[in-house]
């Protein structure tokens, strides 16, 4: 039996004595897309930050490629992290931004231009290579954000609400990028509020509430249960008193950039 690329077992986390994650189990295989669904404060972002190696669980384990991403640098480098916020330098061009991330990923000067070109081709942004990121639309910036996460040639890409606030054209472009990544065997974990998006993209979905995964399976099965009113009762009972601070409070741009860049170092 092939070991899954990502295995989370009994993961628990608390902030300021408030439970954020509670005994979470999750697996994700290569070339698979898993959608994390649930309301604000359900624990989606916190779980993704655990998997990205930004946080360590207070109980349980997180493994990516059999290694602990919080403690093992090589494991973190196998992960592409795309936060909700734009983690780019607005005054630098698209190519210059990607060059910074390529350097952080340890790519040598001679290979850097090729790595940047490959990431731009995969995300279909080569036409904007010489334009400052700050002059691009929000949807285009999100594609540059995804391209930046690919500099480490990750086996796993984590995306937190990648299509939030973008128009239908930009949404379709981002969906196309994710489809190409899956074809290359990349594992993808995407947090979203949009059931239609999850149904279109994901092989499986996990519905979170109150720091727990309360439903997991195919979207068809989950939607059938929703129509029958089954999960609502459980979700209502397990919703937290308020959203987790790290999931709703906007963070300074420099803080987000530093967090993303840390994963590539």
Q: What is each PLM-predicted segment?
A:
Residues 216-217:
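ABC ATPase "signature
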Residues 157-160:
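Catalytic Walker B motif of ABC-type/P-loop ATPase nucleotide-binding domains
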Residues 52:
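Helix-to-loop junction immediately C-terminal to a conserved catalytic motif
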Residues 37-39:
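The feature captures the beta-strand-to-loop junction immediately N-terminal to the Walker
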Residues 99, 103, 110-128:
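Conserved ABC ATPase "signature" region
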Residues 60-70, 75:
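Conserved ABC transporter NBD signature motif
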């Amino acid at each position: 039996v092939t070991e899954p690329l990502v295995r989370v077992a009994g993961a628990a986390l608390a902030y300021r004595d408030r439970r954020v994650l509670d005994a979470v189990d999750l697996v994700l295989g290569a070339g698979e897309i898993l959608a994390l669904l649930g309301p604000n404060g359900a624990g989606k972002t916190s779980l993704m930050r655990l998997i990205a190696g930004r946080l360590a669980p207070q109980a349980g384990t997180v493994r990516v490629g059999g290694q602990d991403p919080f403690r093992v640098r090589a494991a973190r480098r196998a992960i592409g992290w795309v936060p909700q916020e734009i983690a780019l330098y607005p005054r630098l061009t698209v190519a210059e931004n990607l060059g910074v991330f390529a350097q952080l990923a340890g790519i040598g000067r001679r290979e850097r231009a090729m790595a940047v070109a490959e990431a731009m081709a995969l995300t279909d942004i080569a036409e904007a290579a010489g334009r400052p990121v700050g002059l691009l639309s929000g949807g285009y910036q999100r594609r540059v954000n995804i391209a930046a996460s690919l500099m480490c040639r990750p086996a796993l890409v984590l995306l937190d609400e990648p299509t939030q606030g973008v128009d239908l054209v930009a949404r379709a472009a981002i969906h196309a990028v994710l489809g190409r990544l899956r074809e290359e065997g990349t594992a993808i974990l995407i947090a979203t509020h949009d059931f239609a998006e999850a149904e279109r993209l994901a092989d499986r979905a996990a519905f979170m509430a109150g720091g727990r995964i309360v439903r997991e399976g195919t979207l068809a099965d989950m939607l059938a249960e929703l129509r029958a009113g089954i999960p609502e009762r459980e979700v209502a009972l397990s919703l937290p008193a308020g959203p987790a601070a790290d999931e709703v409070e906007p963070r300074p741009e420099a803080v987000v950039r530093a967090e993303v860049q840390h994963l590539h170092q």
